[in-house]
Amino acid sequence: FQPSTADMQILQDTTHYRVFEVAGNMSNARTSYFHKSIGGYHAAKPRKMQQLFDYQIAKNNVGVLNMLNVKYIIQSNEQGQQFAMNNAFANGNAWFIEKIKFVNSADEEMKALDSLDTKNEGVISKENSEIYLHSLRTNPISKLTNTEFKKDSLASIKLDLYKPNHLKYTSNNSNEGFVVFSEMYYKNGWKATIEGKESPIYNVNYVLRGLQVPAGKHTIEFKFEPEV
């Protein structure tokens, strides 16, 4: 593959983000060759990610592109030349939200994404919400009794380390909160810790990961440690 002008422009940004090429499909190998695309480089995509593409991304749902941290969108002009559009509204690698909505099924979870304010809200389907509510009752760090969270203007979370099998973040929030991570949720293999203590990972927004985070400043890590 030869990089286009748009590719060269995007590659100057060395932060962590995703790129979406409007003319391509989710498995666009060219985009994945140069950038971290929403589909990745492998043809075998997680089924839920393909469904998200078909039902949301293909319909230009900007909120979903934002939650996937799509910072650059590659488009073509009338002459067929590619150009990169900067998406200033991308949610980033991780963010605190103010509210979780519970729905009854995966289908309803997908439908909720039609109008979800992904920067401030999350949606969890019933199967996952039962796990979530159970852990709220049994997790001693939790003082949460509902699904709304105070998010002060200084609340922050930043990505410190990014490797395929190890992610590290620093969070700071004066209130206990809930963080959505722009990383695909996988049921098996990934473990999350907050200050070294294992914490349950929730499946939010159909394809992403969520964590309940205590008040204060914390080191959060995800490690891929499959059981052999």
What is each PLM-predicted segment?
Residues F1-K151, S174:
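Extracytoplasmic
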Residues K71, G80, N128-V228:
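Active-site-proximal, structured, solvent-exposed surfaces of multi-pass membrane proteins
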